Structure formats: structure tokens, C-alpha cells
């Protein structure tokens, strides 16, 4: 293998929105924050959970809503 071409791996802490934390190795050097992990994902828990995407849709509509309305009028 060639030397000096591979990124350095660091041990980072991954924090989920449910409060679960775990350590992993990554090329990132900062802690990582995620929305869903294996402790709270419906596939692993067997419980249904609604993931809030309304905030993203509202943000998109605020940003591009007027532009899309102008295109529809023309």
C-alpha cells in the first residue's frame, strides 16, 4: 500500500436526538449529531415513530415558495 494517501481515522462520539451516545471511528474529527439511531429507529424497536419533516418542508416553502408562485402565474 502507498503511504500518506489514506485519511486519518479518529475516535468520535455520535449523539442521537433520543440521547443515546456511542463511539465509533471516522475520518471526521468533531462529534456527530444524528436524528435516528438503532436505539430509536422503528425497524429495530418495533414501534412506529413519525419523523418530523414538516420543518424542512416549511423551510423550503419559505425559501422558494414565492419563486414557484411566480413561475405558476406566468
From Swiss-Prot:
Residues involved in Zn(2+) binding: 16, 18, 37, 40
Pfam families linked: Ribosomal_L31
Gene3D superfamilies associated with the record: Ribosomal protein L31
Keywords from the UniProt entry: Metal-binding, Ribonucleoprotein, Ribosomal protein, RNA-binding, rRNA-binding, Zinc
Alphabetized GO MF terms: metal ion binding; rRNA binding; structural constituent of ribosome
Mitochondrion found in the keyword field: no
InterPro entries referenced in this protein's UniProt entry, alphabetically: Ribosomal_bL28/bL31-like_sf, Ribosomal_bL31, Ribosomal_bL31_A, Ribosomal_bL31_sf
GO CC annotation terms, alphabetical: ribonucleoprotein complex; ribosome
Cofactor binding, note field: Binds 1 zinc ion per subunit.
Required cofactor(s): Zn(2+)
Domain of life: Bacteria
Gene Ontology biological process terms from the UniProt entry: translation
Subunit description: Part of the 50S ribosomal subunit.
Function: Binds the 23S rRNA.
Annotated family: Belongs to the bacterial ribosomal protein bL31 family. Type A subfamily.
Protein known as: Large ribosomal subunit protein bL31
Organism: Nitrosomonas europaea (strain ATCC 19718 / CIP 103999 / KCTC 2705 / NBRC 14298)
Amino acid at each position: 500500500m502507498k503511504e500518506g494517501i489514506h485519511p486519518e481515522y479518529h475516535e468520535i462520539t455520535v449523539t442521537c436526538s433520543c440521547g443515546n451516545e456511542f463511539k465509533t471511528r471516522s475520518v471526521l474529527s468533531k462529534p456527530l449529531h444524528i436524528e435516528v439511531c438503532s436505539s430509536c429507529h422503528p425497524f429495530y424497536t418495533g414501534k412506529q415513530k413519525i419523523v418530523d419533516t414538516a420543518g424542512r418542508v416549511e423551510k423550503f416553502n419559505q425559501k422558494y415558495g414565492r419563486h414557484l408562485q411566480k413561475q405558476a402565474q406566468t
